[in-house]
Design a protein with these regions (language model features):
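Hydrophobic anchor at the start of a short beta-strand
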Residues: 36, 110, 165-166
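Proline-centered loop/turn at the N-terminus of a beta-strand
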Residues: 109-111, 146
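N-terminal subdomain of nucleotide-sugar transferases
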Residues: 1-47, 54-59, 85, 146
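Alpha-helix capping/helix-boundary segments
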Residues: 96-97, 153-155
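Membrane-proximal helix-turn-helix segments that form the acceptor-binding/catalytic region
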Residues: 118, 128-147, 161
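Short His-centered aromatic/hydrophobic patch
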Residues: 92-98, 114
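A short, charged, and often flexible helix/loop element on the N-terminal side
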Residues: 54-81, 121-129
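Helix-loop-beta element that forms the nucleotide-linked donor phosphate-binding surface
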Residues: 104-105, 143, 155-166
Length: 166
């Protein structure tokens, strides 16, 4: 199966520990015989300027995308269509990776893995302004075909945002 992983968390030369768990997950999928490609949407703070890379043996295309720069989010969205072409599945990781798909979903089946514990108890641990913003962003959790999480508790909290509680 050809899978394109789209993530905002992935190791760079500038930040080698960032998203190492996503890289390991991707490498394990490749070891199981899947054709894995990675698109890393890199914020300015971790972007090392390398656009084509290999991490843990995986081909990586790195696009600049800072959430505070809407033009970069839109540019990333435009490039994602071509970068995911030919994939059997698009697999996004983390809520921030949903933003480029706010205006249009991928053409392929879409799996999303959520890592953000900020959604716990509908953002109860966040300040009021952050909680309000999170509620808007979390509506994007309804868009993927399938959403999985990194823990049972996170799955329970996320069910409130999914159309049928799945």
């Amino acid at each position: 199966m050809r899978v394109t992983i789209v993530t905002t968390w992935f190791p760079t030369n500038r930040s080698p520990g960032l998203g190492v768990f996503v890289a390991r997950h991707a490498a394990s999928m490749a070891a199981a015989g899947h054709d894995i490609r990675v698109v890393h949407l890199a914020s300015a703070s971790v972007d090392d300027g390398v656009r084509h890379d290999r991490v843990m043996g995986l081909p990586v295309v790195r696009l600049p995308m800072s959430l505070s720069r809407p033009h970069e989010v839109l540019a990333a969205r435009r490039e994602l269509t071509a970068l995911t072409e030919g994939s059997d599945v698009v697999h996004t990781h983390a809520v921030s990776t949903l933003l480029p798909y706010a205006l249009g979903r991928p053409h392929q089946p879409w799996l999303h893995t959520e890592h953000w514990s900020g959604i716990a108890q509908r953002g109860a641990e966040l300040g009021s302004l952050a909680r309000a913003g999170a509620q808007v962003v979390l509506r994007l959790e309804r868009r993927p075909d399938v959403v999985t999480t990194v823990s049972d508790q996170l799955a329970a909290d996320l069910r409130a945002y999914r159309p049928h509680g799945e």
